[in-house]
Each structure stands twice: as structure tokens, then as C-alpha cells.
Amino acid sequence: KGIIVCMTRTQDADVTKACRVQLANTAGANLFVSIHCNTSDAWDTSANGLECLYATNKKALAAQNKKLAKTILHSLTKTTRLKKRGVIKRNGLYILRKAKIPSTIVEVGYLSNKKDLKTIIKESGQNAIAQGISDGIIQALEGNR
């Protein structure tokens, strides 16, 4: 689809939040999507599903952030069939607070939940997650034209 992806890392090495945000802000990117695995307090195995986090602290980006989060979550729910927990406003998270472009953190499931974990670790689940996120990004970019 002609989309250029800029990865913050390609190996299992720690990259600081500040470095990730700086890369997104200086790379000429249109969107910043940070992908995470969730876990619950005390490893509560009942918590499960997908979430997309967004920030409203920058008024110029607030609506775009929420729309990006909703679009990716909707697409991801279709491809993974995991529970849709919703979009959640989180102004205190460094990555979302410091991004100067539309951004979201995508929580792709709970490591503490057996069903979610199975999706996260299986290649077919990883492909479904990747497809859902990429479909959502494409929809978000097409909606911004």
C-alpha cells in the first residue's frame, strides 16, 4: 500500500521511551503506534482482551488520537476475535504525552490470560494481530486524506 514503516527496534533490546518518541517525532511519520502486551495486577487470569490507549493533553491531536485508537481497535477485534475492552484515555503515559503526531498504544492481549497468551505466542495469532493493526493504520491514513 506504499506505507513506509519506521521501527523503533528490530531486535530484543531495550529502547527508552524518550528515544521511541524522539524517533516518531523526527522521522516525518504520520502516525505513532506503540504495540504492547498487557498484564493484570497479581496476574488475575480473568482479565483479557484488547485495548487502545490515547491521550487528550494536546488539544490539536486529541480527536485524531481517539479516532486512531478506535479504528485500530475495531480492526484488531475483527482479525483476532479477542474481547474488545475499549479505547482508554491515558494522559499520563510518557509516549502518548510527548508524541507530536497522532498516536496510540495498542495492548494486544493479556499475558496473564490463557486465551490471550495463546493468540500472542502462536504464529497465526501474531499474524492476526499484525493484520488487524496494519488494516487499522491503513483505514486511519485513508480517513485523513
Where are these regions (language model features)?
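Active-site-proximal helix/loop segments of hydrolytic enzymes
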Residues: 1-145
